[in-house]
Amino acid sequence: MVPSRRTWNLGATPSLRGLWRVGRVQEPKPGMARPAPASPAARPFPHTGQGRLRTGRGKDILPSGEEDSTSRTAARPSLAQCRALSVDWPGPRSPHRLYLTVQVENLKEKLISQAQEVSRLRSELGGTDAEKHRDRLMVENEQLRQELRRCEVELQELRAQPVVPCEGCEHSQESSQLRDKLSQLQLEVAENKGMLSELNLEVQQKTDRLAEVELRLKDCLAEKAQEEERLSRRLRDSHETIASLRAQSPPVKYVIKTVEVESSKTKQALSESQTRNQHLQEQVAMQRQVLKEMEQQLQNSHQLTVQLRAQIAMYEAELERAHGQMLEEMQSLEEDKNRAIEEAFARAQVEMKAVHENLAGVRTNLLTLQPALRTLTNDYNGLKRQVRGFPLLLQEALRSVKAEIGQAIEEVNSNNQELLRKYRRELQLRKKCHNELVRLKGNIRVIARVRPVTKEDGEGPEATNAVTFDPDDDSIIHLLHKGKPVSFELDKVFSPWASQQDVFQEVQALITSCIDGFNVCIFAYGQTGAGKTYTMEGTPENPGINQRALQLLFSEVQEKASDWQYNITVSAAEIYNEVLRDLLGKEPQEKLEIRLCPDGSGQLYVPGLTEFQVQSVDDINKVFEFGYNNRTTEFTNLNEHSSRSHALLIVTVRGVDCSTGLRTTGKLNLVDLAGSERVGKSGAEGNRLREAQHINRSLSALGDVIAALRSRQGHVPFRNSKLTYLLQDSLSGDSKTLMVVQVSPVEKNTSETLYSLRFAERVRSVELGPGSRRTELGSWSSQEHLEWEPACQTPQPTARAHSAPGSGTSSRPGSIRRKLQPSA
């Protein structure tokens, strides 16, 4: 600090900025201990009176807020000491420092009083009526718990009594209702406990919030007090510096006057003194400038003090508002808590009263039920005595029942033997009747199916319908050709609206004949695009004749599994450009030939034709999926996927009767013929032209065979085509044959439709004679002696019942081969 009285040393005069810098350095840093306050005698300002501040004009100023804080000055000795000083301020703005100090002390006292008020509120909160009421409720809850425990003990005692429950008893229902009410009361008590804990938690949260607001206010007031202290120190240092400068001014003047009366000997010293004097004047001007800056800073401090007062007032108002809100919320919570507790207590009292009343009724009912319990106990003892003698009665009854059951089993066995003999006799009769029915229907049955009109048929006159049906006779079809109606009579005619199942109903009788040991052939005929492949194969969602025939075949085999053992093998081939190819072989392009068996039996077989043994329809589908991909189809003007070859699906069924040893061999040939077409209309060129020529040539050979059979010629030209040669067994009286004629209904295809229907009529008039059944009577009758021929890629027959030449059952010693003719 700069001392209040100091003599200037002219030899080393410091600048005013340096003095100000020294005063700033001596100021204590934050966190360091402040020096002890100077005594009144050492202070630079003498005091004039008690509690008054004297200004430079001699007026007394009473500090604001003194009358309001006189009751609390005894607890603050520093404030009393500050008021006891009377300072003679050198400047017109000097009283503000002490005034600010007084205001700071007043704020501190207010903070202390507020802290005391908060602690008083906390002490009052500890003993409010709400908490007393809460304690009282806790005591009441404890009493209710004791009452509930006592009721539970009584209920357990009642349950422990040996009471026999009775269904529909009014007392048991009341007891269950009481138990339900008791559980509800327990739940409500638990809910009341939860509500009470929530209210206590809310009160604790409000108290914590108030404490947090008080801490923030204390921190703010402490910061403001530190700022006031710092400004006070700077103001005090400034005044001390000004006072010291004023005190040193007279010696300078005296030196100047003394220099004026000196002799000439000291002129040199005079000039030096003048230089120093000029330097001192500059320093005085600088000090005046610094003084102005200090006054400006003092004014800024005054403005800052005003702002701090406004903030303090705002904080006080906020604290008061928060305090009021807290009191209102606490009062509201207290009221809600009291109201909830009263409602819960009243409800608990009412329900507890009802529980006590019901419990008394239950006790009365239990007392009335004791005689009934004694009666039931006596009845139970009597039943127990009867049960002791029950095992003897049960053993006697079991012996008699066993004897009756044994006698009944013997009678059933004898009846079963008789029924088995009758069943076999009826089975043979059914086969004879079925074969007779098929024979009476005709050797080659012909059915026609008309496909619907499609978008590929186009529009205009050529796409009009030229086919009509007889509503009274489903075997007649009418065709309008060149303006003239032509009628045809077949075995069955199906309209475009007929389903795949309707068509298959005409076929399923032949499948049964195949299982019985007959050769069956089903083939589709018609122009390309007439729907032959759809009728034979169909789609996965709506299968055709092939899939349905195989499903029926395996279904019939499964039904006869208890009496017969069957072995089913399949093979597939196609005739493409008069070349026979194996669709299931490893090399589908390999050419195969049709040979006669060298044993002289007249049977035909195809060397190298692949044959697979199957157990279900799924096995067949997996095998034929590969074969279907190998079949030749191409695009023509008449059909996008035109079949360019004749496809044959050959299924061989070999069966053995487990009881008689009778062996049967049936073969099912499913043939999808390639479509007949006119070369000019189908647009065939190159390979397509050569394919069409071969297809038409083979179908023409088929027509020649049908014509020879119809006229009963001695020589039938089966060898003119691979197709007719392969179908020789199916067309020579050794098979049951069905032909499906597919026709198109539109006007532009009437020529092909007319040709197909005429060919169908010629086929229908052919008489082949009754079909023969392939059977062999073995020399054994038990299933354990059955031997199956393995299914492998060896030469297999394609049109006869046996699989290979010389390997059939005819070469087995002691076997008999005969044909069973159906009785007329």
From Swiss-Prot:
Does this UniProt record's set of keywords contain Lipoprotein? no
Q: Which Pfam families match?
A: Kinesin
Keywords annotated in UniProt:
ATP-binding, Cell junction, Coiled coil, Cytoplasm, Cytoplasmic vesicle, Cytoskeleton, Membrane, Microtubule, Motor protein, Nucleotide-binding, Phosphoprotein
**UniProt topology in membrane:** Peripheral membrane protein
Q: What does UniProt list as this organism's lineage? A: Eukaryota, Metazoa, Chordata, Craniata, Vertebrata
- Provide the tissue specificity: Predominant expression in the kidney, testis and ovary. Also expressed in brain, heart, liver, lung and uterus.
- Please give the InterPro entries that the UniProt record associates with this protein: Kinesin-like_fam, Kinesin_motor_CS, Kinesin_motor_dom, Kinesin_motor_dom_sf, P-loop_NTPase
* Origin superkingdom: Eukaryota
For binding ATP, which residues are annotated in this chain's numbering? G526, Q527, T528, G529, A530, G531, K532, T533
The entry's protein name is Kinesin-like protein KIFC3
Region annotated Disordered, chain positions = 27-79, 771-824
